[in-house]
């Protein structure tokens, strides 16, 4: 067997699959810097912890200066990861408002912060933010031990 040829085929296949996956996500729709405030809540899950986290902050979304507020709940799962839900988030900008819901899975980082990946859906009647409607957005969410967080959004194509 020609290992050089075999490896070349594997690398080519990997690159083609990677290109396909990258096409699934569009260009970054926005980024926001947030401040978290968290408190423990009853999880009802056999002694595993749960947290309620409120966030407030701002940044850019679809080229607009925005402010956002949301409340998330996250429940620790038996494997130590966290399952998070935001049932009510709001985006404010001079051109209108939008609401959103998110779900994500995350883990504690060695630094003491958290790292989540997930998806969000938005609804708005604002023409300026109307591009949010009817799309699913993937997100990355990272926070530090002091509760300073970064939220980055990417539309799924």
Q: Where would I find each of the regions flagged by the language model?
A:
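Beta-strand-enriched cores of mature, soluble protein domains
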Residues: 11-157
């Amino acid at each position: 067997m020609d290992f050089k040829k075999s490896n070349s085929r594997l690398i080519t296949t990997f690159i083609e699959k990677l290109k396909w996956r990258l096409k699934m996500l569009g260009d970054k729709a926005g980024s926001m810097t947030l401040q978290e405030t968290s408190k423990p809540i009853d999880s009802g899950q056999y002694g595993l912890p749960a947290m309620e986290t409120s966030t407030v902050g701002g940044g850019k979304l679809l080229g607009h200066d925005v402010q956002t507020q949301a409340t998330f709940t996250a429940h620790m799962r038996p494997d130590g990861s966290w399952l998070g839900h935001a049932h009510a988030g709001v985006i404010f900008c001079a051109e209108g408002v939008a609401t959103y819901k998110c779900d994500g899975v995350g883990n504690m980082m060695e630094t003491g912060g958290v790292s989540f990946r997930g998806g969000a859906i938005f609804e708005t009647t604002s023409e300026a933010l109307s591009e949010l409607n009817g799309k699913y957005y993937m997100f990355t969410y990272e926070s530090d031990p002091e509760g300073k967080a970064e939220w980055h959004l990417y539309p799924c194509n």
